[in-house]
């Protein structure tokens, strides 16, 4: 067969397709609701474990039965197709029942981020016009004061440990919250209600809404549909991830993020993989549960992988990892080698994998896999996804190896920002061929072999006193080229009354701090313009701080200006 000649443009050549089968490339996205997709995949396996909540296994038979109870209860509360329902919940069984029940009805699950300010929560709730909210008791204090100022009429509450039975609830002293509808009474209200089995599938109906962080402006609702989430499921089903029925998926990313609810929850749940629910974001608890339940799949950050290595370098559980994926940050090649050696020592046949994504694109854009796992990359586009770089000034597509804004064609993309048409129009750009590109705001490039390299956010920059635009990720990459540096993130902080860049770093303990800093100076002088030098370095002992989303906590780092080392 004659090899196809490359044009030089990734969107035309799609060189990553050589890593995929025809089945993956041409896989049909199911035209049904998310619930129907999950049901169709698992109706013949009623005894398989769908969820694992601490030590309690929940079968698909029980899952579907509970979803029907919750569906009837919401119908009794007046929830109907097209309604928005606010959820302020971590990953508990009741949260999953609720999301799927609302999907059966045709309602939209609005996943509120409990770390939002009271004003953010108030604004986001009111713009949805939701009359019903579901919140776990443990997060009720986050919304208690704002509820009178919102459109919410009915508040359903439930202890996070509700599914663990009466003895555990007694030990945890779970109490009903006054002036709310307890979970038990909520379910009781629907006993005589009929289900919504006659609700037919419609294309691009809103299904789940997550929210942007709001760190660079007002948070916005990111509207995902049945089609977009089913497309995400399809990408994972056919693209070589080897998700085998009754494998175990460690779901530690909060479900109010797209990656948390779509990639680490609905994808494995649909494909018959048992989801290990983790309602509390705590590294020590994560280690205990990984050691105990021995998951095969996990998407996480460098910080947790480092924690596991340092906590207990050798553990029988680590051998079971088929796909240990780091997303949301660059993994330096020498650190990747260390992680691979660690997995090998534990008897795992897998290597560390990397991925890149964003909420607006359903969670995953690129990923490494069994046939393509190159050091330093964010992987290749998923089988039905296209990625290319575009010139920041002209908006023209760039050829291989040229850096620009990464833009994405994906069936997993959001339908838009909720009630923000201007922001939606800015995010999506339609080209002359009628293709709608998602403009990620990330700087990067694509190589001839199909691998995607992500440098960082274009906005991750500032203008210095000399009027120069300094991209912080360029400083990070230079520092990370020093093999004794394990992690690095550069942020802008106010130091001595002016804005300047500070490099936050974690070192391997193979050399003295003085030796490593001297090496950083030498490497940065060879690779960076003088005004880009990292003259201020903040060292962290174990790992850089991580936010509940699993991403690096840049807000905390910007505020942390104590004990900074000045490098002349």
Segments and roles (model prediction):
Residues 30, 47-92, 96-100, 117-122, ...:
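Conserved AMP-binding/adenylate-forming core of the ANL superfamily
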Residues 380-384, 396-429, 451, 468-470:
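Conserved ATP/PPi-binding loop(s) of AMP-dependent carboxylate-activating enzymes
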Residues 296-300, 309-374, 386:
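Gly/Ser/Thr-rich phosphate-binding loop
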């Amino acid at each position: 067969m004659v090899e196809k000649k490359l044009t030089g443009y990734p969107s035309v050549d799609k060189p990553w397709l050589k890593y995929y089968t025809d089945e993956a490339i041409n896989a049909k996205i199911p035209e049904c609701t998310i619930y129907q997709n999950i049901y169709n995949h698992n109706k013949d396996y009623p005894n398989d474990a769908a969820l694992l909540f601490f030590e309690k296994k929940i079968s698909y038979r029980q899952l579907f039965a509970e979803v029907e109870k919750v569906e009837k209860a919401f119908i009794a509360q007046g929830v109907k197709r097209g309604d928005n329902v606010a959820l302020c919940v971590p990953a508990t069984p009741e949260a999953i029942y609720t999301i799927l029940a609302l999907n059966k009805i045709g309602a939209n699950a609005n996943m509120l981020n409990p770390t939002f300010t009271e004003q953010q929560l108030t604004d986001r709730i009111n713009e949805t016009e939701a009359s019903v909210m579901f919140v776990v008791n443990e997060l009720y204090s986050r919304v208690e004061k704002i509820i009178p100022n919102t459109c919410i009429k009915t508040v359903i509450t439930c202890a996070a440990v509700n599914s663990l039975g009466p003895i555990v609830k007694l030990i945890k002293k779970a109490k009903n919250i006054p002036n709310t509808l307890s979970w038990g009474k909520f379910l009781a209200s629907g006993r005589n209600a009929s289900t919504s089995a006659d609700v037919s599938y419609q294309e691009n109906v809103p299904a789940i809404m997550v929210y942007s962080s709001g760190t660079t402006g007002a948070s916005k609702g990111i509207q995902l549909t049945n089609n977009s989430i089913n497309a995400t499921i399809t990408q994972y089903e056919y693209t070589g991830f080897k998700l085998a029925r009754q494998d175990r998926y460690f779901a530690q990313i909060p479900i109010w993020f797209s990656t948390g609810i779509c990639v680490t929850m609905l994808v494995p749940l649909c494909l018959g993989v048992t989801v290990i629910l983790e309602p509390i974001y705590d590294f020590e608890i994560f280690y205990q549960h990984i050691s105990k339940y021995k998951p095969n799949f996990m998407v996480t950050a460098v910080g947790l992988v480092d924690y596991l290595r340092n906590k207990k370098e050798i553990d029988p559980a680590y051998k079971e990892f088929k796909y240990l994926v780091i997303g949301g940050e660059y993994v330096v090649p020498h650190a990747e080698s260390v992680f691979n050696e660690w997995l090998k020592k534990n008897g795992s046949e897998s290597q560390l994998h990397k991925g890149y994504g964003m909420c607006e694109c359903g969670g995953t854009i690129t990923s490494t896999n069994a046939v393509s796992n190159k050091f330093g990359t964010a992987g290749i586009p998923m089988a039905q996804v296209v990625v290319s770089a575009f010139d920041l000034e002209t908006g023209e597509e760039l050829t291989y190896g040229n850096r620009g804004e990464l833009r994405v064609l994906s069936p997993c993309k959001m339908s838009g920002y909720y009630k923000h048409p201007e922001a939606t129009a800015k995010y999506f750009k339609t080209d002359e061929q009628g293709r709608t590109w998602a403009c990620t705001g990330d700087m990067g490039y694509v190589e001839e072999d199909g691998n995607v390299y992500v440098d960082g956010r274009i906005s991750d920059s500032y203008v210095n006193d000399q009027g120069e635009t300094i991209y912080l990720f360029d400083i990070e990459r230079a520092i990370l080229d020093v093999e004794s540096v394990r992690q690095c993130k550069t942020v802008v902080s106010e130091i001595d009354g002016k804005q300047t860049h500070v490099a936050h770093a974690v070192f391997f303990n193979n050399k003295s701090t003085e030796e490593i800093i001297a090496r950083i100076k030498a490497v940065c002088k060879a690779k960076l313009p003088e005004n880009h030098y990292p003259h201020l370095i903040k060292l962290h002992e174990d790992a850089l701080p991580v936010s509940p989303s699993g991403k690096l906590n840049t807000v905390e780092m910007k505020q942390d200006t104590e004990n900074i080392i000045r490098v002349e």
